[in-house]
Amino acid sequence: MESRDVILRPVITEASMAELDNKRYTFDVDTRATKSQIKDAVEDIFEVKVAKVNVMNVKGKKKRMGRYEGYTKKRRKAIVTLTAESKEIKLFEE
């Protein structure tokens, strides 16, 4: 799996923005990606050093449109912690 295929998008929430001070970044990743693949992808794309990766699977929520029910897509979220000497990821600074 290519590095650009592993990381789908950054997660921009109030909680994830509060963790930027601790050098913790949150990404939506491919559901088949492992921790080591996520670590390699972040180091390759952003040229930083990763200390650890925490991963969680988020199940889809039930949604209704009139009388029709369905589910949103399940997703996998990764919280990446950078080392102390690593530089910041510029994607989140705006």
Curated annotation (Swiss-Prot):
Pfam families: Ribosomal_L23. InterPro entries: Nucleotide-bd_a/b_plait_sf, Ribosomal_uL23-like, Ribosomal_uL23/eL15/eS24_sf, Ribosomal_uL23_CS. SUPFAM superfamilies: Ribosomal proteins S24e, L23 and L15e. One of the early assembly proteins it binds 23S rRNA. One of the proteins that surrounds the polypeptide exit tunnel on the outside of the ribosome. Forms the main docking site for trigger factor binding to the ribosome. GO terms for molecular function: rRNA binding; structural constituent of ribosome. GO terms for biological process: translation. Gene3D superfamilies: 3.30.70.330. It comes from Ligilactobacillus salivarius (strain UCC118). The gene is rplW. This is Large ribosomal subunit protein uL23. One of its GO terms (cellular component) is ribosome. It comes from the Bacteria. The keyword Hydrolase does not apply. Keywords: Ribonucleoprotein, Ribosomal protein, RNA-binding, rRNA-binding. Belongs to the universal ribosomal protein uL23 family.
